[in-house]
């Protein structure tokens, strides 16, 4: 990555620190969360707030705060907030895929597992992708095509690990209460979902250990993983667009106001939506910027040009499929370009040897 790209990513992280956290303290949102946690109640929850999950007090305090924060999104009493949560949750899959691929390119499988569950995963889930993703992406250089550790990782394991470790807990936490789940069990599922980076990373490692060896080419496995990420992110974005239109909701409600023109918070739900808007906007923007810079770098190396039509298709995709869907597509196209160039190089060398 160039110094310009790195600077842009660091700027995204600084903006997240200001707009997400500093402004949340200034407008009273953090105080509102703390007050509800202290009073053992949360908006939309008729019963008591659950405060014991693991028996480890610091961890239980964190999970209680997560329950207070995510309850309005999972309960579904405000459709616009829940729809935005669906789009954000689905967009996390392409972002996490980029991190997983980079870690497995640099490390052996067990080392990659340790880094994901002890560093990248906790940072993303505890601090938020809006602040953390740009910094993680700034560490990534142009992916190496000939990485030895990458050849030992079957990218297809990303698919079942995310289905079981991320999507399934997310669906369980989204079940309506008290229609299907009790209020207590719903809080438990919300707390369980917080550990998805741990579950998915361990499952990837376990699936690889079980398979024993890679059954398909690395390029083909990467294609499957990118298609899965593209499908999930596109589905979440299309659900947001279509149901907003069917329910006659305003699309402008999903566009974050300028920080100097934000209305005062009237409720916890408004604060949650504002927080998620900045989190999604900055993390998706940073990841898309990284993907575009990666593609531009590879295209320049191959002495190619990016056509105006491809830029137009990218803009249309961002609007109708979502920014992170285009990240998955751009990443796959760029890796394919690298693979194609890598296959041509040995053939050219072989022809040169024959001529000599």
From Swiss-Prot:
The keyword Cell inner membrane does not apply. The keyword Signal applies. It is a multi-pass membrane protein. Residues 1-16 form the signal peptide. One of its GO terms (molecular function) is isomerase activity. Its EC number is 5.4.99.-. The chain crosses the membrane at residues 81-101, 116-136, 161-181, 187-207, 227-247, 275-294, 314-334. GO terms for biological process: paxilline biosynthetic process. Keywords: Isomerase, Membrane, Signal, Transmembrane, Transmembrane helix. Paxilline synthesis protein A: Part of the gene cluster that mediates the biosynthesis of paxilline, a mycotoxin that acts as an inhibitor of mammalian maxi-K channels. PaxG, the geranylgeranyl diphosphate (GGPP) synthase is proposed to catalyze the first step in paxilline biosynthesis. Condensation of indole-3-glycerol phosphate with GGPP by paxC then forms 3-geranylgeranylindole (3-GGI), followed by epoxidation and cyclization of this intermediate (by paxM and paxB) to form paspaline. Belongs to the membrane-bound ascI terpene cyclase family. This is Terpene cyclase paxA. It comes from Penicillium paxilli. The lineage of its organism: Eukaryota, Fungi, Dikarya, Ascomycota, Pezizomycotina.
């Amino acid at each position: 990555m160039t110094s310009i790209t790195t600077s842009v990513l660091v700027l995204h992280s600084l903006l997240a620190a200001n707009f997400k956290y500093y402004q949340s303290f200034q407008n009273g949102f953090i105080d509102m969360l703390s007050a509800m946690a202290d009073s053992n109640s949360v908006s939309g929850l008729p019963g008591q707030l659950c405060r014991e999950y693991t028996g480890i007090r610091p961890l239980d305090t964190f999970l209680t705060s997560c329950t207070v924060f995510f309850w309005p999104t999972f309960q579904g009493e405000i459709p616009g907030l829940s729809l935005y949560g669906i789009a954000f949750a689905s967009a996390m899959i392409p972002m996490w895929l980029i991190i997983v691929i980079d870690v497995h390119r640099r490390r052996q499988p067990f080392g990659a597992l340790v880094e994901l569950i002890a560093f990248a995963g906790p940072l993303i889930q505890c601090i938020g992708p809006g602040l953390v993703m740009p910094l993680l992406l700034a560490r990534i250089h142009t992916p190496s095509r000939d990485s030895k550790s990458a050849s030992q990782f079957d990218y297809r394991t990303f698919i079942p690990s995310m289905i079981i470790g991320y999507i399934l807990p997310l669906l369980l936490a989204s079940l309506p209460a008290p229609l299907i789940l009790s209020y207590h069990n719903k809080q438990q599922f919300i707390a369980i979902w917080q550990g998805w980076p741990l579950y998915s990373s361990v499952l990837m490692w376990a699936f690889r250990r079980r398979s024993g060896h890679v059954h398909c080419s690395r390029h083909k496995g990467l294609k499957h993983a990118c298609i899965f990420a593209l499908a999930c992110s596109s589905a979440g974005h299309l659900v947001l667009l279509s149901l907003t239109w069917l329910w006659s909701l305003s699309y402008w409600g999903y566009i974050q106001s300028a920080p100097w023109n934000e209305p005062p918070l009237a409720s916890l739900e408004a604060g949650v939506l504002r927080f998620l808007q900045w989190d999604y906007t900055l993390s998706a923007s940073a990841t898309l910027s990284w993907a575009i810079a990666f593609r531009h770098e590879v295209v320049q190396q191959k002495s190619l040009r990016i056509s105006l039509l491809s830029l137009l298709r990218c803009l249309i995709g961002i609007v109708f499929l979502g920014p992170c869907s285009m990240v998955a597509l751009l990443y796959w196209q760029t890796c394919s370009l690298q693979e194609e160039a890598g296959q041509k190089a040995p053939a050219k060398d072989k022809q040169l040897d024959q001529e000599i």
